[in-house]
């Protein structure tokens, strides 16, 4: 049986589909307490209200797959369309990920630092990449075999960025 951890699980749309496809969900997380309550009632008690930025690999059970529908508000036509932005934790500079000229290295354009966090909700994708990096460094047995991501159509221009990040982490991507 395939197992999965469900990040940014919301009310459980992706989780329900994964369950129906035969996956066993080990753990799910979302920031919104109402979404977590709905998930718990419809999918199961394996859900936890948490900020993904505060999770560490020690909090994540070993699973075959990680699924994540990271926030889309900054990409969606119904949202602010602010794009994916990062904030340097060394100097505080905020910058938009340049999907047209992306090469690995979200180095801060101001100080060159590579320590950053999401500055927009859609930048939370990079928190998954942080967790994968933590797994590789601290608990390689927790690296999932499969990554499943879903998002809105407006993510399209950023797909090469995601593909580059997946490749850097040792995964092939299909979109």
For each of these PLM feature ranges, what is it?
Residues 1-175:
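Conserved active-site and SAM-binding loop architecture
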């Amino acid at each position: 049986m395939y197992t999965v951890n469900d990040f940014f699980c919301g009310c459980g749309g992706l989780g329900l589909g994964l369950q129906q496809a035969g996956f066993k969900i080990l753990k799910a997380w979302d920031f919104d307490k109402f979404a977590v309550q709905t998930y718990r009632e419809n999918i199961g008690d394996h859900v936890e209200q948490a900020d993904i930025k505060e999770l560490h690999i020690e909090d994540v059970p070993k699973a075959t797959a990680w699924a994540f529908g990271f926030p889309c508000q900054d990409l969606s036509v119904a949202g602010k369309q602010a794009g994916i932005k990062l904030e340097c934790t060394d100097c505080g500079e905020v910058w938009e990920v340049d999907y047209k000229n992306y090469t690995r290295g979200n180095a801060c354009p101001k100080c060159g630092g590579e320590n950053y966090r999401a500055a927009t909700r859609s930048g939370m994708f990079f928190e998954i990449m942080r967790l994968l990096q933590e797994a590789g460094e601290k608990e390689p047995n927790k690296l999932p075999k499969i990554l499943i991501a879903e998002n809105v159509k407006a993510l399209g221009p950023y797909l090469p960025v995601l593909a580059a990040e997946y490749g850097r982490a040792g995964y092939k991507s299909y979109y």
